[in-house]
Amino acid sequence: MSEHHSGFVAIIGRPNVGKSTFMNRILGEKIAIMSPKAQTTRNKINGIYTTPDAQIVFVDTPGIHKPKNELDTYMDKAALSTLNQVDAILFMVEADEEKGPGDGYIMRQLAEVKKPVYLIINKIDLVKPDDLLPLIESYQHDYAFAQVFPISATMGNNVDELLTALTDALPVGPQYYPEDQLTDHPEYFVVGELIREKILELTRDEVPHAVAVQVERMKDREGGKLQIEAYIIVERDSQKGIIIGRGGQMLKQIGIRARHDIENLLGDKVNLKLWVRVQKNWRDNNAYLKSLGYNTKDLR
């Protein structure tokens, strides 16, 4: 019988390089929300990949960027604090983007960490193969990566090869979670993230960064349905108006789309009730951030 390998692997990179898409591809389920808008992921999200020979806990981190408010500071600290707590690190970049200052900043942070770092070049389906080598060389000039994997998280190219390499590199260890468990986050957290994803998909650019979702209640099933009640938090009355929409149509569409994904995730029929609440400047209010589950003091 072969030895069982297990460990924790951080996925790090600039906003919007495809970290959440990659993790959802591996798990075969949507537990990390996805959007073309930056700053989609706000918390560290653990995804659990299990085979007979290994268990890899992937930590999908917020995209690292220059902070503009207390929430941004929390997200950067959440991402960087992960680096010393894992067995390996995946540094993800985009095949169709040149190396930028943000990538250089991340590599300088990685230089302080004594863990193997894998360069993951995502979105190779968007470029010609001949364009990859110069990009790889530009990154290797700045950092000694353990290995380089060009992949497509959307199409699945080279993802299996990466998983094999990670399995071989991780230490011999136990299975930390049951084989059918995909995340260690509670259901209400994932439900809130799925609601927020639909807001990102449907609303204008000025709204998404100012939105949070607070799941107030997930009641026992009544009449065969799970009762979920949640508040959508915004900073201004004008944003509340956008979320609700004319005649409540936008809020209705958010609810319909979110309910569909929540039902797929939980395997139950859902009755979803949504309200919109204005909390001015909540992204700079440490007490309110803490009530939503963000606490920068925990990351010092």
From Swiss-Prot:
- Where this protein primarily resides, as one coarse class? cytoplasm
Give GO cellular component annotations, separated by semicolons: cytosol; plasma membrane
Which residues are in the KH type-2 domain? 203-280
InterPro entries the UniProt entry points to: G_ERA_dom, GTP-bd, GTPase_Era-like, KH_dom-like_a/b, KH_dom_type_2, KH_sf_prok-type, P-loop_NTPase, Small_GTP-bd
Q: Where in or outside the cell?
A: Cytoplasm; Cell membrane
Is Cell membrane included in the keywords of this UniProt record? Answer: yes
Binding residues for GTP: 13-20, 60-64, 122-125
**Keywords for this entry?**
Cell membrane, Cytoplasm, GTP-binding, Membrane, Nucleotide-binding, Ribosome biogenesis, RNA-binding, rRNA-binding
GO terms, biological process: ribosomal small subunit assembly
Q: Where is this region: G2?
A: 39-43
Q: Where is this region: G5?
A: 151-153
Record's function text: An essential GTPase that binds both GDP and GTP, with rapid nucleotide exchange. Plays a role in 16S rRNA processing and 30S ribosomal subunit biogenesis and possibly also in cell cycle regulation and energy metabolism.
- Family assignment? Belongs to the TRAFAC class TrmE-Era-EngA-EngB-Septin-like GTPase superfamily. Era GTPase family.
This protein's name: GTPase Era
Instruction: Report the source organism.
Output: Lacticaseibacillus casei (strain BL23)
Organism classification, top ranks?
Answer: Bacteria, Bacillati, Bacillota, Bacilli, Lactobacillales
